[in-house]
Amino acid sequence: MILSFHTSCFAGTTEEIASLLLFVEQSGCTFIRNGKHYDAPEARKHIAKKYNYFKDRIHTAEEFIHYSATKSTMSGQPYRVVCNGEGMTSSDWLLAELDKVRTTILEEDHETPDNNTDD
């Protein structure tokens, strides 16, 4: 039973991380890393590369954000993102998206075929 729960949590984390990477890639936002600007697909590549490097330390989506998408390992400077003219830290932006992902998953888990009123 415990193994099943652990596996289920890992699967959920893997899905959340994949969802966040896709969100970054499709965002159309500009990412600022160490003063340089990168488009969304390039940012996704960089975050995925860091994720692969830190994978053994990452057990939650929050740890994924912390290790892979928060700040430069070299300079310590926080990553920033600019979407529609508004800037924020990439950490705040991704944590907000993670909340949306989890809310969507919870809503989908509570829907059942018996509740379908289209008949």
Language model features with spans:
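Sec-dependent signal peptide recognition
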Residues: M1-I2
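N-terminal secretory signal peptides
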Residues: A11-Y53
